[in-house]
Swiss-Prot record:
Protein name: Glycogen synthase
EC number, UniProt record: 2.4.1.21
Annotated residues for binding of ADP-alpha-D-glucose: 15
NCBIfam families, per the entry: glgA
Catalytic activity: [(1->4)-alpha-D-glucosyl](n) + ADP-alpha-D-glucose = [(1->4)-alpha-D-glucosyl](n+1) + ADP + H(+)
Organism listed in the record: Petrotoga mobilis (strain DSM 10674 / SJ95)
Family that this chain belongs to: Belongs to the glycosyltransferase 1 family. Bacterial/plant glycogen synthase subfamily.
Keyword Protein transport: no
Pathway(s) it belongs to: Glycan biosynthesis; glycogen biosynthesis
GO BP of this protein: glycogen biosynthetic process
């Protein structure tokens, strides 16, 4: 079985969010499990800035997408995912993908639709024996639409099965109906049984309806998106396709997130004593009061309400009355950036606010915190809670999506559980849960050590995830063949 993994972002070449981490890791583990897999992505401008492309192999030049009206030629460059033998093909054209922000909204439909058609041309020219295409989110969702319209009679492409992985259903790709002509797609697709959605073209809807199989990135999220609360208007068609909808939990790359070998952290972590060394080193590094008994709480993520940053901001004044420290790393909504920066002036030894994204600092925070805060409004999977547990940091979460699937409530009676959580999206519930965690950290030291050990024993490696994706590829292929 040969699989094409198609993504608009792939780490480390181009990264805007968690999708890039998945796309940069999962194919390696699928390859290690014995399947033939390769990756396709656009050649974004920053790749040329950050890599010596003379080391990339130019495998095709002068290709033109078959269906799309934008007939600018493209070249196909070939390299490998870091530390692996997984081939990655880059689609390079001089007229597109030159923004610093890869999701720059200017001409985003042109960029994504051109990429979808060009990816199919690349597959046909470079890997004609491909069996399955795994697409990701709305940016690649026109691939199955092209396959079931323009390429329906193509001798090579018509045999390929498709899987759509939804990483966040809140992003759907809504455009005026004229874009169908630009993409070279038939106008009959603009109807309620295809891509039409309240007078707009909904690209993700097309991916859902035209793919053989759909999956999302946690079992709970697969159920949630079939409800009005979480479905963002697509719950109806997801219910219709519920038999073809699966949830597979993301993993994390243990070769990168390794508490024994991570070059970014202060000390290797094998024991709780090692954990405390990282904590006091982090306190010193950030200019906080150096004291291993203070509860160090951290948040790493985008400062948007989806991540629960509004709840966090509402409880900060009360939270800071306690013997705690708070570390934040991330960027986002300006009002939250400004609010947290202002707090540092009031509590300089209790708060460290870092309005940036810094991989080195992120690893240090995961390794040095006592509590990792993730009170998301919704969370398809979430990686931060897995990273934190990998380094023995206890997650406090809202039980939604992948957070519900990965964090179990600590029970002092049987000593099982990896964290603390709440259900209702309310600041009072968050504050109560945090105070409970702080109490266990400061007053129940034996229990806290148990939770630390439970976190360190959790297995979120991609080996398990890869096996489930391989099973899903086989299901998609059987469905395509009519079995």
């Amino acid at each position: 079985m040969k699989i094409a993994y198609v993504s608009y972002e792939v780490s480390p070449f181009a990264k805007a969010g968690g999708l890039a981490d998945v796309a940069g890791a999962l194919p390696k583990y699928i390859k290690n499990a014995g399947e033939d897999i390769y990756v396709v992505m656009p050649f974004h401008k920053n790749i040329e800035n950050n890599y010596d492309i003379s080391k990339f192999e130019v495998v095709k030049t002068g290709l033109i997408p078959d269906s799309h009206t934008h007939k600018s030629p493209f070249s196909v460059y070939k390299s490998y995912l870091e530390g692996s033998s997984v081939v990655i093909y880059f689609i390079k054209t001089d007229s597109l993908y030159d923004s610093k922000n890869i999701y720059d909204e200017e001409n985003i439909f042109l960029k994504t639709s051109y990429f979808c058609d060009s990816a199919l041309k690349t597959i046909k020219e470079c890997e004609p024996d491909t069996n399955v295409i795994n697409i990701n989110d709305w940016h690649t969702s026109l691939i199955p639409v092209y396959l079931k319209t323009h390429y329906l009679q193509d001798n090579i492409l018509k045999k390929i099965a498709t899987i759509l992985t939804i990483h966040n259903i809140g992003y759907q790709g809504l455009f005026n109906p004229e874009v169908l002509n630009q993409a070279g797609l038939p106008n009959y697709l603009f109807n309620m049984n295809a891509l039409e959605y309240y007078g707009k073209v909904n690209v993700l809807k097309g991916g859902i309806l035209f793919s053989n199989i759909i999956n999302t990135v946690s079992p709970t999220y697969a159920k949630e998106i079939q409800s009005e609360e979480y479905g963002y208007g697509l719950e109806g068609i997801l219910k219709v396709r519920s038999e073809d909808l699966f949830g597979i939990l993301n993993g994390i790359d243990y070769s990168i997130y390794d508490p024994l070998k991570d070059p970014h952290i202060f000390h290797p972590i094998e024991s709780y004593e090692d954990k405390l060394k990282n904590k006091t080193s982090l306190q010193e590094y950030l200019g906080l009061t150096k004291d291993e008994n203070i509860t160090l709480i951290s948040f790493i993520g985008r400062l948007f309400e989806q991540k629960g940053i509004d709840l966090i901001s509402k409880i900060m004044d009360l939270l800071l009355l306690n013997d705690i420290q708070f570390v934040l790393l991330g960027t986002g909504d300006k009002k939250y950036e400004e609010y947290f920066v202002t707090l540092t002036k009031l509590y300089p030894k209790k708060i460290s606010i870092n309005i940036t994204f810094d991989v080195d600092l992120a690893q240090k925070i995961y390794a040095g915190s006592d509590i990792f805060l993730m009170p998301s409004k919704y969370e398809p999977c979430g990686l931060g809670q897995m990273y934190s547990m990998r380094y023995g940091t206890v997650p406090v979460v809202r039980y939604t999506g992948g957070l519900k699937d990965t964090v179990s409530e600590y029970n002092p009676k049987d000593k099982k559980g990896t964290g603390f959580g709440f259900h209702e999206y309310k600041e009072a519930d968050l504050l109560y849960t945090l105070m409970k965690a702080i109490y266990f950290h400061q007053k129940r030291k034996d229990d806290w050590t148990n939770i630390f050990e439970n976190c360190m024993k959790e297995d979120f490696s991609y080996e398990k995830t890869a096996k489930k994706y391989i099973e899903l590829y086989k299901i998609a292929l059987d469905k395509k063949r009519g079995y």
